[in-house]
């Protein structure tokens, strides 16, 4: 049985509706740090194995959780567990900084960026471009039904970045005004497909039809080493509106052929050539 403090972190991860793969991976690493603080070393190995399973179960569509679980060794030493969890967090922050620097190079003065959902990685790219004195505008979808786009809008407003919020249904219309699309990712599959908030596929199709370059921002810890697109389990959380059940699949899968490139901390990779 995992300690109550660890279980509470897992519950917090499961409750979260807005923040994405990076936030969940960070909370997962914090769960392992808490485990190191709470348990006697004689109980540690079994608890680590249990927590590795539970972390992945929080959201099987997020490769960051799978890779975190793989990164943490089964050990009876608290110092090793703590060291590995901290190292994962350090690598996460370093990767985001490097990726943001690379991604900001894609943004030119006068650009109109279109995005979907909330990605802390995409936000970091946009902020970095702003710090480099580039002038641009962001079009963002409200991203229903959880409205992650409104969270992004607040962050952009705080950073003094011009933006416009649209309904999801208008992404095909407004992408014509964009010069570049950048979205985040919850997983890049082994065969180069992009798993992200439902609606990402539609935006990619609209951009393809209108010759708008479509980029995905994903640190390498969001790349799944074994899972292919046909094996992805997409979570579903149905809604009830006026006594009517509405299907609500949380994620979709975008084929690599619609992706101009994947921005990583190691550079821009072209799927599936650079992933296989």
UniProtKB/Swiss-Prot annotation:
* Keyword Protein biosynthesis assigned: yes
Function (record text): Catalyzes the exchange of initiation factor 2-bound GDP for GTP.
- Name assigned to this protein: Putative translation initiation factor eIF-2B subunit 2-like
Q: Which organism is it from?
A: Pyrococcus horikoshii (strain ATCC 700860 / DSM 12428 / JCM 9974 / NBRC 100139 / OT-3)
Tell me the GO molecular function terms: guanyl-nucleotide exchange factor activity; translation initiation factor activity
Keyword Cell wall biogenesis/degradation (UniProt):
no
The entry describes its oligomerization and partners as: Complex of two different subunits.
Parts of the chain that traverse the membrane: none
Q: Which UniProt keywords apply?
A: Initiation factor, Protein biosynthesis
Ranked from the top, the taxonomy reads: Archaea, Methanobacteriati, Methanobacteriota, Thermococci, Thermococcales
UniProt-listed SUPFAM superfamilies: NagB/RpiA/CoA transferase-like
Q: Which Pfam families match?
A: IF-2B
What does the similarity note say? Belongs to the eIF-2B alpha/beta/delta subunits family.
């Amino acid at each position: 049985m995992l300690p109550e403090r660890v279980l509470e972190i897992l519950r917090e991860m499961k409750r979260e509706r807005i923040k994405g793969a990076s936030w969940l991976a960070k909370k997962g690493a914090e769960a392992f740090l808490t485990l190191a603080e709470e348990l006697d070393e004689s109980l540690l190995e079994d608890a680590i194995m249990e927590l590795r399973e539970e972390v992945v179960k929080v959201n099987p569509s997020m490769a960051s959780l799978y890779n975190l679980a793989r990164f943490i060794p089964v050990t009876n030493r608290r110092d090793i567990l703590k060291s590995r969890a901290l190292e994962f967090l350090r690598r996460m922050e370093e990767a985001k900084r490097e990726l943001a620097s690379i991604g900001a190079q894609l943004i030119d003065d006068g650009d109109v960026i279109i995005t979907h959902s909330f990605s802390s990685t995409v936000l970091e790219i946009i902020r970095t471009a702003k710090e480099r004195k580039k002038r641009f505008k962001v079009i963002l979808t409200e991203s229903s039904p959880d409205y992650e786009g409104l969270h992004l809008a607040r962050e952009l407003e705080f950073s003094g970045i011009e933006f416009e919020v649209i309904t999801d249904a208008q992404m095909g219309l407004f992408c014509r005004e964009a010069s570049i699309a950048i979205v985040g990712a919850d997983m890049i599959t082994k065969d180069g497909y992009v798993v992200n908030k439902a609606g990402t596929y539609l935006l990619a199709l609209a951009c393809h039809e209108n010759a708008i370059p479509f980029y995905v921002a994903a640190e390498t810890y969001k790349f799944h080493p074994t899972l292919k697109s046909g094996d992805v389990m997409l979570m579903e959380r149905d809604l009830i509106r006026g006594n009517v059940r509405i299907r609500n699949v949380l994620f979709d899968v975008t084929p690599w052929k619609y992706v101009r490139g994947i921005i990583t901390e190691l550079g821009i990779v072209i799927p599936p050539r650079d992933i296989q």
